[in-house]
């Protein structure tokens, strides 16, 4: 396989791909990779490469900046989403705490009401006991006076 065979092979490949949509602009016309016969083509390629180098460098810088910007934006978005999720969890936690406090306050009010009812019942029972004691003491004193009265009053 000689240098001419290589060139013909490249020409066939590039011509075959130019018929495909979207592929023709990706392939340049075939050029030899190196100067086999000393006809000066290799210097042309080197000059073209040097001329294209600033354009490629500019393109590389633009792509790098665009990629870095996209990465920073994605990171920023993730940080914001994480912060929003943390804030939502904290809000939900505070909502749960407030609901628990409201339930405990309601129970405390109910217990306070029951405490007042029990205190009133206890006072009522105490008054009843005091009244029963007085009645009992009166009955005992009246019973103890009755036998003396019976002895003094013979009927």
UniProtKB/Swiss-Prot annotation:
State the superkingdom.
Answer: Eukaryota
GO biological-process terms attached to the record: response to testosterone
Q: What InterPro entries has UniProt attached to this entry?
A: FAM167_domain
Q: What is this protein called?
A: Alanine- and arginine-rich domain-containing protein
């Amino acid at each position: 396989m000689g240098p001419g065979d290589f060139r013909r092979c490249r020409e066939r490949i590039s011509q075959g791909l130019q018929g495909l949509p979207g592929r023709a602009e990706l392939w340049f016309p075939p050029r030899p990779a190196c100067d086999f016969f000393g006809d000066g083509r290799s210097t042309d390629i080197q000059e073209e490469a040097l001329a294209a180098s600033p354009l490629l460098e500019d393109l590389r810088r633009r792509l790098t900046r665009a990629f870095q910007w996209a990465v920073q934006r994605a990171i920023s978005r993730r940080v914001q989403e994480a912060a929003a999720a943390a804030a939502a969890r904290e809000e939900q936690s505070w909502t749960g705490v407030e609901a628990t406090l409201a339930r405990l306050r309601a129970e405390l009010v109910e217990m306070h009401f029951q405490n007042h009812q029990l205190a009133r019942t206890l006072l009522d029972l105490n008054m009843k006991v005091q009244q029963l004691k007085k009645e009992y003491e009166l009955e005992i004193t009246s019973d103890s006076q009755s036998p003396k009265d019976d002895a003094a009053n013979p009927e």
